[in-house]
């Protein structure tokens, strides 16, 4: 037998793989006549699929039948309806073929699933494998690798991964990447919720765009509303020049949001690459800046522009490297040896900070055998002579819990020391003069360093502990001309404005204006203590005697002059510079042994923990910036 092909009718609803399907029927099948046509036609319609029943042959058969023949067929079918019903039931119970729309829906669903997987894989590729390899060759991680390294495993929830820029000038329409060069979202660090964003240098150099501003802005808004700390991992060439004013407008919006979040949630910037031009102001507005040595740079104008405009030759490291901003400009609060070190520093710093300004400073369970240092060693911190230097950090470490001190701005203005530590498990901010550098005098940079730290601690409910050993402000025309009066006033303002518990301990020198500004009783410090070695006066005994007893010393015989001077200095020291003089007038709450310092501070923090000072209503003060 030979097969005859029955062409299928062209319907749009048919699936592509069914449009050319052939159905074969035997050529020796009985041909329809007037008498057998109804039965044969009905039989064939029952035996073959609906598709064949719609074919041209079926239509030809049905349209050529006479009315009588059709009527006869109906009567015959009715007469044998039981038999025919059985045949129909058999047809209905047969497996129902999948229709074209159902197959199409399943195919589309599979395509969508594959598309999502493909898109997620594409997100991991950033600007492409070639650029990722180049990033690794520089000793740097990609944006997503950095997030994975700092957050708890599997805790990152990304927001806005598929947003793309909408610009076309200068070939941007051919350079669209999902996320537009920044990854934003939420995650956890040591179980704590945080907001995080990370610039992707593999996408257009991480250049700051309108979409980056949109994504970061949404993150800042959500984090501020939820009371979450914000970590920004920066690695960018600066503004996206091709976007023009849209990029600049994005900067402005970001700066405004940084300012609104200031004092509400902690903001930490981690510099892991370049940051140039207007982009530098965002990290400059945040609370802390961490830089990675050798790979991170910050500057408003680069070496080439400086050379063109001023003729000055300067390399990128000297201009804006980590060492420069840590030691000279004070922009960087911490410096790490590499990216991993910077991320570890950020995690450690966060452990000292509350999530927002409504939370108290963090506390942790303590074990006295582990956290308590050798308090008796404090009795040996102060050298026997007032002119001899020592490292104030040794005193801090003996007062605080073991291994808990995290110094901030360690390389900037080293004549002052600030940082966070735990004392009996509670986080506190430490401020101290450093006799090992410039005898611990206050200058412009030290004043800025101290005032800024005070204001941050006060904003986030972190108590302040001040250790005083300061002979005064640094003298000199340079300091006066650069505004030491204005800068020194910042310390007074910051301490006076602060409402957190404030405790001060005078270890040795507290002379003149430096005594007043360094958390004295007169500017409302809650607890003021002093060691027996404290010298609280307008100036030291030696200087005072030289002024007050100048005539007597001049009149003394040369061979007796030095003996007379020493006698006068000892008398002045006992009568005017002794801590008991200040204690008797109420300017010092108590004179204590050095070994008692830790216990007294812990007790003071305990009874001051619910301190609620009254403040005058005002919009804000006007700190002498």
Give names to the regions the model predicted:
Residues 2, 13, 36, 48, ...:
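Short, low-complexity interaction segments enriched in Ser/Thr/Pro/Gly
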Residues 53-61, 70-86:
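Short hydrophobic alpha-helical membrane-entry/anchor segments
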Residues 1-55, 61-63, 89-90, 94-95:
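Charged, low-complexity N-terminal segments of organelle-associated membrane proteins
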Residues 37, 58, 86, 556-564:
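Alpha-helix capping and helix-coil boundary motifs
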């Amino acid at each position: 037998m030979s097969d005859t092909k029955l062409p299928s009718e062209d319907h749009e609803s048919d699936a592509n793989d069914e449009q050319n399907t052939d159905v074969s029927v035997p050529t020796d099948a009985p041909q329809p006549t007037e008498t057998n046509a109804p039965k044969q036609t009905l039989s064939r319609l029952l035996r073959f699929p609906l598709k064949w029943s719609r074919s041209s042959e079926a239509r030809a058969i049905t349209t050529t039948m006479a009315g009588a023949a059709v009527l006869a067929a109906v009567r015959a079918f009715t007469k044998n309806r039981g038999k025919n019903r059985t045949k129909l039931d058999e047809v209905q119970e047969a497996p129902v073929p999948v229709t074209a729309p159902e197959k199409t829906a399943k195919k589309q669903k599979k395509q969508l699933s594959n598309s999502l997987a493909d898109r997620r894989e594409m997100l991991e590729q950033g600007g492409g494998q070639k650029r990722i390899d180049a990033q690794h060759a520089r000793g740097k991680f990609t944006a997503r690798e950095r997030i994975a390294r700092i957050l708890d495993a599997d805790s990152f929830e990304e927001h806005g991964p598929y947003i793309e820029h909408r610009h076309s000038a200068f070939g941007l329409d051919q350079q669209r990447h999902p996320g537009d060069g920044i990854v934003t979202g939420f995650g956890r660090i040591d179980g704590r919720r945080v907001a995080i964003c990370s610039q992707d240098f593999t996408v257009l150099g991480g250049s700051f765009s309108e979409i980056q501003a949109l994504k970061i802005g949404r993150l800042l808004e959500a984090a501020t509303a939820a009371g979450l700390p914000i970590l920004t991992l920066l690695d960018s060439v600066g503004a996206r020049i091709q976007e023009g004013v849209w990029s600049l407008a994005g900067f402005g919006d970001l700066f405004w949001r940084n300012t609104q979040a200031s004092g509400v949630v902690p903001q930490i910037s981690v510099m892991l690459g370049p940051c140039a031009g207007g982009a530098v102001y965002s990290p400059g507005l945040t609370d802390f800046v961490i830089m990675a040595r050798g790979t991170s740079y910050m500057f408003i104008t680069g070496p080439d522009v400086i050379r063109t405009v001023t003729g000055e030759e300067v390399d990128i490291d000297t201009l804006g490297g980590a060492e420069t901003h840590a030691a000279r400009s004070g922009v960087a609060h911490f410096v790490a040896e590499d990216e991993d070190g910077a991320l570890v520093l950020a995690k450690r710093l966060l452990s000292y900070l509350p999530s927002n300004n409504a939370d108290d400073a963090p506390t942790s369970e303590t074990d006295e055998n582990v956290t308590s240092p050798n308090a008796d060693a404090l009795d040996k911190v102060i050298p026997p002579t007032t002119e001899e230097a020592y490292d104030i950090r040794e005193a801090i470490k003996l007062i605080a819990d073991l291994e808990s001190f995290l110094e901030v701005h360690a390389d900037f203005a080293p004549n002052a020391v600030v940082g966070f530590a735990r004392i009996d498990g509670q986080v506190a901010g430490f401020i101290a003069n450093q006799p090992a550098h410039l005898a611990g005098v206050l200058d412009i940079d030290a004043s800025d360093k101290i005032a800024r730290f005070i204001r941050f601690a006060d904003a986030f409910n972190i108590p302040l502990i001040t250790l005083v050993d300061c002979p005064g402000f640094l003298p000199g025309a340079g300091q006066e001309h650069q505004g030491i009066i204005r800068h020194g006033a910042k310390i007074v303002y910051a301490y006076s404005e602060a409402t957190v518990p404030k405790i001060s301990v005078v270890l040795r020198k507290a002379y003149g204006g430096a005594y007043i500004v360094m958390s004295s009783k007169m500017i409302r410090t809650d607890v003021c203590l002093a060691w027996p070695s404290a010298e609280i006066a307008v100036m030291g005994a030696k200087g005072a005697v030289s002024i007050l007893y100048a005539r007597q010393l001049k009149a003394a015989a040369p061979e007796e002059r030095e003996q007379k001077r020493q006698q006068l200095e000892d008398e002045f020291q006992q009568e005017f510079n002794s801590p008991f003089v200040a204690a008797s007038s109420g300017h010092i709450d108590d004179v204590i042994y050095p070994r008692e310092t830790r216990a007294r501070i812990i007790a003071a923090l305990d009874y001051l923990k619910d301190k609620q000072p009254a403040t005058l209503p005002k919009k804000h003060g006007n700190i002498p910036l």
